[in-house]
């Protein structure tokens, strides 16, 4: 399809990605080849003529390449992310220029590999509470990395069994006082792969999926590192043992440290998208080739003709498009901020968007792949189809890089902060605006309301998702205010008692942003034929959002029972109308055929020997018995 530039993997980048993927199919050096592809991307990109400003678009290229690599092998994509986005990102975002020269450039040249050690046995999402300690030894000008208890053991650490260095988060302690979590570069293995004294690495062995990543446990027993190994962008220790930071508040400093690491959440969104698109391509291709049932005395019909098959797959395809457009939007903002040298700590709305997208996209990926598996029947259960493999590999996406419920709390806190800031500028004006907005929403749902928008049109759907977000935001503000200010309760208990409301508001916000970005993509599409098809999927996505929350809309009288039935009918009709054009859409994903390895989709791949059923070396016992029965 034409006119989809910037929304999917563009053709020049597809060629580069396909070249990298073909390169990766070699029998040896799988991860090494992948790392080469990531490291040499700026040079290859220039040769391919992709971008004029390679530096400005470098983050975009890395994220999209991560999406493509996830289609090849999820484990490989994740391990590349560990090396360059997590470990490398910690050095470049938390370290000084000297740290970048000393650690990052050798990493890029593949002189060593690293790992990212933040999660502990006792603390995962609550990074502030980690128990690993880095105590400054003034006499020796060293930090002593130690773990006072078993709960401080670093767990689920990717590349733990092979990495040479680790970016270790620990409480920085000077003269018995903690300055909060900081990041340190700790040597793990020498050039021969031998662990340094005081370091223990334990293989966590088999997991549900992603077994190509060597997750392990790291234990430090009084490991000494030079003072210079502290990544000191937000906090440094002088030779005389004095702590200095450009940010005086410990809480603000901690938030700044974490903010610089949030781009990895957007990377997870891109990786989830890669798995989602591949699963949909396989399931949709299969549904257009497989036939089951049909009218009496007539040919069986393709299973995509069955209503539930189309409903399940087309709804997910619309969601994949919406997440694609929204993630590209977030990527553009991130790329521009980094290119202009803006601090991510000041981009709270972007942090919230990346956190919300990570939660929404990974939950949708898990749901999508489950439906893809069911829609492909027994073949979906076979490893050769790759869907079951993708399911197992991506299940962890909902908890790593931040548990999804925690991610949604990041979104809600930012929305509350925006609400508070808006009303603090001018208290009287804020009260008036709040009153008029509330009155307007009540009028909109009263018997006096006169709705000029046809139920189900794009304008109606956009207003519906905006209405839901506004109402949930005001409702959460009033609940928190009542519990904390009126009832004098503590904030933690008040927040916890509103958690269902918090997650509902955050998802409503992401739904609204996604539908608006989808609408923008439709309007910017230069090709009329493509624009018409995109509009159908945009309507389908918006209709799906309203339909899945129809109970809430009925409760708030935004929908009447009749309107709810119209929404359901529109959802079914749209799925029916786009099911044949879905082949064009998945073709526009530009997924390299070398990555698909699913013969039942009708895509030949002679390089995928593992997807074939080999002939037995000798006749099976049951075959001999069957031959005897044939003679009787």
From Swiss-Prot:
Residues involved in FAD binding: 376-381
Which keywords does this chain's UniProt record carry? FAD, Flavoprotein, Oxidoreductase
EC numbers listed for it are 1.3.3.-
**What highest taxon heads this organism's lineage?**
Eukaryota
InterPro entries registered for this protein in UniProt: ACOX_C_alpha1 (IPR055060), Acyl-CoA_Oxase/DH_mid-dom (IPR006091), Acyl-CoA_Oxase/DH_mid-dom_sf (IPR046373), Acyl-CoA_oxidase (IPR012258), Acyl-CoA_oxidase_C (IPR002655), AcylCo_DH-like_C (IPR036250), AcylCoA_DH/oxidase_NM_dom_sf (IPR009100)
Q: What Pfam families does the entry give?
A: ACOX, ACOX_C_alpha1, Acyl-CoA_dh_M
What cofactor requirement does the entry state? FAD
Give the record's GO CC terms: peroxisome
Q: Name one GO biological process term.
A: fatty acid beta-oxidation
- Molecular function (Gene Ontology), one example: FAD binding
Family note? Belongs to the acyl-CoA oxidase family.
The name under which this protein is listed is: Acyl-coenzyme A oxidase-like protein
**What organism, scientifically named, is this protein from?**
Mus musculus
Q: What is the lineage of its organism?
A: Eukaryota, Metazoa, Chordata, Craniata, Vertebrata
């Amino acid at each position: 399809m034409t006119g989809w530039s910037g929304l999917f993997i563009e053709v020049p980048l597809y060629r580069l990605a396909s070249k990298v993927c073909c390169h990766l199919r070699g029998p040896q050096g799988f991860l090494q080849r992948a790392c080469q592809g990531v490291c040499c991307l700026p040079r290859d990109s220039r040769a391919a003529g992709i971008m004029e400003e390679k530096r400005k678009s470098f983050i975009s290229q890395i994220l999209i390449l991560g999406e493509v690599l996830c289609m090849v092998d999820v484990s490989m994509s994740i391990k590349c992310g560990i090396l360059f986005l997590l470990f490398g990102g910690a050095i470049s975002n938390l370290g000084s220029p000297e740290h970048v020269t000393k650690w990052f450039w050798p990493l890029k040249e593949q002189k060593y590999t690293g790992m990212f050690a933040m999660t502990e046995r006792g603390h995962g999402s609550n990074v502030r509470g980690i128990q690993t300690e880095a105590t400054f030894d003034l006499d020796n000008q060293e930090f002593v990395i130690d773990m006072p208890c078993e709960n401080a053991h670093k767990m689920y650490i990717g590349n733990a069994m092979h990495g040479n260095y680790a970016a270790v988060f620990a409480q920085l302690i000077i003269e018995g006082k903690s300055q909060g979590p900081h990041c340190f570069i700790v040597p793990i293995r020498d050039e021969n792969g031998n662990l340094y004294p005081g370091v223990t690495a334990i293989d966590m062995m088999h997991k549900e999926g992603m077994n190509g990543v060597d997750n392990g446990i790291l234990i430090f027993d009084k490991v000494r590192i030079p003072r210079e190994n502290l990544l000191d962008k937000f906090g440094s220790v002088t030779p005389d043992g004095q702590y200095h930071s450009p940010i005086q508040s410990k809480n603000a400093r901690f938030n700044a440290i974490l903010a610089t690491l949030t781009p990895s959440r957007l990377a997870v969104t891109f990786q989830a998208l890669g798995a989602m698109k591949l699963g949909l391509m396989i399931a949709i291709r299969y549904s257009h080739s497989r036939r089951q049932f049909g009218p009496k005395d007539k040919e069986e019909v393709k299973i995509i003709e069955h209503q539930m098959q189309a409903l399940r797959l087309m709804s997910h395809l619309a969601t994949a498009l919406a997440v694609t457009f929204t993630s590209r939007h977030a990527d553009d903002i991130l790329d521009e901020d980094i290119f202009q040298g803006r601090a991510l700590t000041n981009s709270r709305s972007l942090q919230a968007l990346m956190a919300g997208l990570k939660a929404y996209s990974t939950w949708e990926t898990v749901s999508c792949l489950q439906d893809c598996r069911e829609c492909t029947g027994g073949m979906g259960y076979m490893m050769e189809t790759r869907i079951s493999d993708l399911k197992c590999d991506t299940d962890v996406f909902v908890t790593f890089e931040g548990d999804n419920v925690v991610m949604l709390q990041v979104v809600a806190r930012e929305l509350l902060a925006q609400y508070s800031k808006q009303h603090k500028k001018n208290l009287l004006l804020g009260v008036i605006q709040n009153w008029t907005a509330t009155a307007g929403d009540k009028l909109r749902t009263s018997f006096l309301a006169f709705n000029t928008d046809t139920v189900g049109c794009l304008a109606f759907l956009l207003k519906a998702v905006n209405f839901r977000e506004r109402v949930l935001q005001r409702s959460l503000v009033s609940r928190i205010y009542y519990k904390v200010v009126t009832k004098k309760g503590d904030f933690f208990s008040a927040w916890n008692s509103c958690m269902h409301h918090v997650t509902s508001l955050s998802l409503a916000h992401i739904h609204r942003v996604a539908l608006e970005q989808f609408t923008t993509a439709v309007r910017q599409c230069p090709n009329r034929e493509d624009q018409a098809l995109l509009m159908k999927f945009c309507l389908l996505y918006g209709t799906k959002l309203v339909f899945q929350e129809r109970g809430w809309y009925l409760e708030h009288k935004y929908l009447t029972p009749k309107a709810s039935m119209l929404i359901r009918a529109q959802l079914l009709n749209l799925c029916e109308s786009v099911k044949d054009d879905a082949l064009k859409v998945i073709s526009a994903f530009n997924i390299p055929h070398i990555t698909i390895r699913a013969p039942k989709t009708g895509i030949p791949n002679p390089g995928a020997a593992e997807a074939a059923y080999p002939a037995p070396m000798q006749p099976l016992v049951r075959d001999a018995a069957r031959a005897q029965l044939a003679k009787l």
